[in-house]
Regions:
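Long, low-complexity, intrinsically disordered segments
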Residues: 222-238
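Residue-level signal for the start and early helices of compact helical domains
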Residues: 1, 29-34, 111, 139, ...
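Mature extracellular/secreted ectodomains of secretory-pathway proteins
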Residues: 48-221
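Non-coiled-coil alpha-helical tracts in long, low-complexity regions of eukaryotic assembly proteins
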Residues: 3, 17-69
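Composition-driven recognition of long, low-complexity, acid-poor segments enriched in small hydrophobic
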Residues: 23-26, 220-224
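Fungal secretory targeting signals
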Residues: 1-22, 120, 238
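Intrinsic structural disorder
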Residues: 5-16, 29, 79, 83-87, ...
Length: 238
């Protein structure tokens, strides 16, 4: 009788343990984000100056302990990067390139900068989590953080100025469906329109004032020059 009671207790414990362990894992690793369309996740529009805060708000909810960030959330952040990049090429560059130089083009450029801030915030958050989970992404994290800080500064430099948002048909649950090929010719044309717009409106600060990001100062050494070259090459890449 005593043996039967002990056996029953052991069976009960064995049955409960997997359930408790499973519940514990779910509570620690449950995904934070759900699928979003580009138009749902975008922070572009309104006025420039708060892109940093807006991006962090859109992407809030990850655990403070980044080792516990769920794989599905890393996939989501990567997908945000992808669809924002696609919108940058397929929507913003295309529209800016087709716009007559002037304030309208600059308003589009400000929205493009806001989009870059969201894209790069998602990228940096994902890399920070990957680093916390043991992946060697230090160099990439430093590179993307530098680009993020630059675009945040560009956005803040245009604080209070109108930003014209564009819609784009893409979703984080299937970013490949909206894939847009990189187009250097289109990107250059859009950049030329922004340059001409700055001159036409009398805006100061050159390309950097509109967030084009072209470096005008000579790099201090070859390593810095290489980083600058990489930034120029991947500005419109994932």
């Amino acid at each position: 009788m005593k043996f039967s009671a002990v056996l029953a207790a052991l069976v009960a414990v064995a049955s409960a343990a997997p359930a408790q362990d499973s519940a514990s894992k779910l509570s620690k690793r449950a995904p934070v984000f759900t699928a979003k369309t580009f138009d749902e996740i975008t922070i572009s529009g309104g006025v420039a100056g708060t892109a940093k805060e807006d991006a962090l708000k859109k992407l809030s909810g990850l655990p403070t302990d980044l080792t516990k960030v769920d794989k599905a959330d890393l996939t989501f952040l990567n997908s945000v990067n992808k669809i924002c990049n696609q919108a940058e090429i397929g929507a913003y560059n295309a529209k800016i390139a087709a716009t007559t130089p002037g304030e309208d083009a600059l308003a589009l450029q400000r929205a493009k900068i806001q989009n870059k801030v969201l894209k790069l915030t998602a990228t940096v958050m994902g890399l920070q989590a990957q680093q916390a989970q043991g992946q060697n992404v230090t160099a990439k994290l430093e590179e993307e953080t530098k680009k993020l800080n630059k675009n945040i500064a560009d956005d803040q430099a245009n604080k209070g100025k109108t930003a014209t948002a564009l819609k784009f048909n893409a979703s984080t649950d299937n970013p490949t469906a909206s894939n847009v090929a990189k187009d250097d010719v289109l990107a250059k044309k859009a950049g030329d329109v922004v340059d001409a717009s700055l001159k036409a409106t009398g805006a100061g600060g050159g390309a950097a004032a509109a967030g084009k990001g072209k470096k005008t100062t000579k790099p201090a050494n070859k390593a810095v020059a290489d980083v600058a070259a990489q930034e120029a090459e991947v500005e419109d890449e994932e």
